[in-house]
Amino acid sequence: MLKVVISSPVATQSGYGHHAREIITNLIERKDAEWDIKLLSMPWGHTPFTYPISNDWKRRIIPLPIQFQPDIFIQITVPTEFQAVAKLNIGVTAGTEGDICPAEWIDCINRMQIVVVPSKFTKEVFENTAKSSNKLITCKLIVVPEYFNESVYTTLNAGGNLDILDQIEEQFAFLSVGHWLTGNIGEDRKNVSGVIYSFVNTFKGKKSMPALILKTSGATYSTMDRMDIENRIGQVLDQPIFKNTKLPNIYLLHGDLTDTEMNSLYNHPKVKAMYSLTKAEGFGRPLLEFATTGKPLIVPFQTGQKDFLNEEFIVEVKGQLTPIHPSAQNEFLIDGAKWFTPDYGHAENLLKDVFDKYKNYIDNGKRLRYHVNKGFTKSAVQPKYDELFNVITEFESKIPKQIQLK
């Protein structure tokens, strides 16, 4: 039996945490009889370790440092943390959200024999960076998409205790979901600030105004984080253009919701559409989850979400690629990289049209639901996992086996 260690932020409330749990689930389901699978539970920034994991998974968790050399080591993290500690090393990463990554990341992914990415966009970023920096990718680069849990994210399971939404007086609300990350107004990666600005600018002073439900946080769900988010909302609303006029209501949802509660939020009758101006996604899980509702999705057709969205069925926000602003740059989002900047005038026209002529957008929302149900459930992505396991088996056959001397 091969000794396998999977290092990931498995217990965290993060995008990488969700992706890790999908990978681990499929590995255990397929290989538990052949592999002795252990888990390393790693942090992910300041995100909380609050995701409930099963007792079986808890029993598999081992402490650092590892006291043995694994036959297979699987790391679900950013490329700079990849380590070749086993006979077969597999990396899983969403890479960066810019159109290029640091050139040294090509050396990082080459430490592994296999690297799994969640979208064609991420793969293309690695390939384009390798080409522009005259480097060769030596690892096997495989796209295995993320998926949604069809037993949770469904209109048939739209119950759940979200009584707090009863406090919302408006019967029509746009929903936006995403962490509020570093960057000036209009420059944070999820573009939460741009969502607020464009929504308020669209409906300010109108006789009839919808609401915006904002499910966001910084890195934690602490009181201090909530206060910071409220302050950042205030900074957006403090623009001179919004002075001395009535503004639409914004309702902040700040806290840890279960998958069932998120599904209830998506399907709540007051939530009529999702609105996102994201600049870039490695994948874009909340967009996929919301697509299961059959409601309109107002979003750019760019980066990782292109894999699971259909351009004909979304309410597409137009825009262009622009350099990443210095206020949003870091070791992953580098100077010289570009990402999407929306045409705010176009986005505001779409918001107004969806609000005024909502019935015109319902059919395409239902078509998008059919599209994701057909292609991005757990069962639908299994052929991609088949491809991955075929590659793993090929490499696995080359691992030296210990034999007993007679």
Language-model region placement:
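Donor nucleotide-sugar binding/catalytic pocket of nucleotide-sugar-dependent glycosyltransferases
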Residues: 113-124, 132-159
